[in-house]
Amino acid sequence: MFIKIAAKPPQLVYLEEVHGRTHMTETDRRKYYNLKIGYEGEKKVYDYLNQFKQGVCIWDVRLDISGEIQYDFFVIVNGIIFVLEIKNHYGNYTYKDGNLKSESGFVSRDVFSQSSNERDKFEAFCFEHNIHFKIVNEVVFVNENFKVINNVEGIKFHNMIAIENLAKYMCSFEITDEDIAIAELIIKHHIEKSKNEQKDYYPYDKMTRGLKCPECHRFLKVERSAKRQIVCSCGHKMSKTEAICEAFEKIEMLKRDSVTATEVCEWVDISTTRIRKVLNEYCYKIGENKGRKYKSKDKRL
């Protein structure tokens, strides 16, 4: 049973929308890829564990324990807190001196020692808050195409079978009030806003216009002649109202400012009259007539 799930990281949402619209720095391209792959791996674990009602599960917590530390999953069951670190590496790797190196040269450093350090810090958190459950930390490689090709003695590279076995273990026990109380205490100390947010933004006026599909993130052609629904080649469907709202939301994020109906029209081939009608209903209005701009209602202050 999940009592906290993760939203897609704001930095990933931003870079995902920028990708394909303008030239991104090499640093941001790497960051985008790592965030995307990491989120997809965590989502895979969430989708599997979310099938079960036993066990108390938490997805994505940042704690301040002598510095900010991000934990992928906590699973609390039968007097044990499982601390899961999820890796979504793909392809063939060699393991040496604590590091994983891919055939393309990518290096994942201190794979297990970093996890042990995070466990030690969480133990300190538990001691401070009088939590006496056993702590078990595991690094789990969830991509079925991940493989360590050299011989490594004494180290276990857990895969999705470890998650399946954990689910079976969860199903053997009922949730207790203490399980829930500990989970709620952990969530209470969650840092909502990370220090690792996007700091450098790209100029909107240099970006390619156009709506992207919320599912596959490819550019989506929205034609005025469409009757009721816009259908992406991936199968995702949107109403015209949803397309207008999606375009507005993403433009506002990319501009980091208020939005005009004309700017939305640059993304979706729908009449400005229809766009204004939708924005008037769902957004906060600034100004009148042709100079009118719009903001999300939760950002009007």
Predicted regions and their residues:
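Surface-exposed interaction regions that form or flank ligand-binding interfaces
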Residues: 1-69, 80, 105-281, 299-301
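Generic structural motif recognizing short loop/turn segments at the entrances and edges of beta-strands
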Residues: 53, 91, 96-99, 153-155, ...
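Cell-envelope/extracellular polymer assembly enzymes that use nucleotide-activated donors
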Residues: 72
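Short beta-strand element of the conserved SAM-dependent methyltransferase core
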Residues: 75, 230-232, 294-295
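Active-site beta-strand-loop-beta-strand hairpin of nuclease catalytic cores
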Residues: 75-99
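Assembly/interface hotspot detector across virion components, adhesins/toxins, and nucleic-acid enzymes
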Residues: 93, 283-285
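Conserved short loop/helix modules at catalytic or binding sites
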Residues: 101-103
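Short Lys/Arg-enriched helix C-cap and helix-to-coil transition segments
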Residues: 286-301
